């Protein structure tokens, strides 16, 4: 039986993010890398997450922390709401909302992730968490106020 990709693309996992997570292909752009990294969190694949972090970030030191977090977190969904490139296409940004439950509580990560392309491969560098007012429209595009959507 086929399984839809956890990244929210509505495409089968085997045709979507699996080729990147398995190492068969290299993600062609920051959005594909971000979606495949989300899948790696869902599938609890610390190796892929570390491999796709830029080497300067020292992600191998985070292995134990990543693995410990897997046991307590259930990922519920991903919404990408913006992506763009700079510096001749070698720096990319992807803004998203990732919903999860942890310890019985529902939460959301809202982030603008930064990616760098080196030697034909994209790497995750870091992310910023934009601040939204409670009455601002939710960035996920639901049409609801932030406080009634991802800000809960």
Curated annotation (Swiss-Prot):
Cited Gene3D superfamilies: 3.10.450.50
Residues making up the signal peptide according to the UniProt record: none
Pfam families, sorted: SEC-C, YchJ_M-like
PANTHER family per record: ADENYLATE CYCLASE-ASSOCIATED CAP C-TERMINAL DOMAIN-CONTAINING PROTEIN (PTHR33747:SF1), UPF0225 PROTEIN SCO1677 (PTHR33747)
Family the UniProt entry places it in: Belongs to the UPF0225 family.
Descriptive protein name: UPF0225 protein YchJ
The organism of origin for this protein: Escherichia coli O6:K15:H31 (strain 536 / UPEC)
Primary gene name: ychJ
């Amino acid at each position: 039986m086929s399984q839809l990709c956890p990244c929210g693309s509505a495409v089968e996992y085997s045709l979507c993010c699996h080729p990147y997570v398995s190492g068969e292909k290299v993600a062609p752009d920051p959005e594909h890398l971000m979606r495949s990294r989300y899948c790696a969190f869902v599938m609890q694949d610390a190796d892929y997450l570390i491999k796709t972090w830029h080497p300067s970030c020292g992600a191998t030191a985070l292995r134990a922390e990543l693995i410990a977090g897997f046991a307590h977190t259930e990922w519920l969904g991903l919404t990408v709401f913006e992506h763009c490139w700079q510096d001749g296409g070698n720096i990319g940004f992807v803004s998203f909302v990732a919903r999860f439950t942890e310890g019985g509580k529902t939460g959301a990560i809202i982030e603008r992730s930064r990616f760098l392309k080196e030697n034909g491969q994209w790497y995750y560098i870091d992310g910023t968490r934009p601040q939204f007012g409670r009455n601002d429209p939710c960035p996920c595009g639901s049409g609801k106020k932030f406080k009634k959507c991802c800000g809960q």
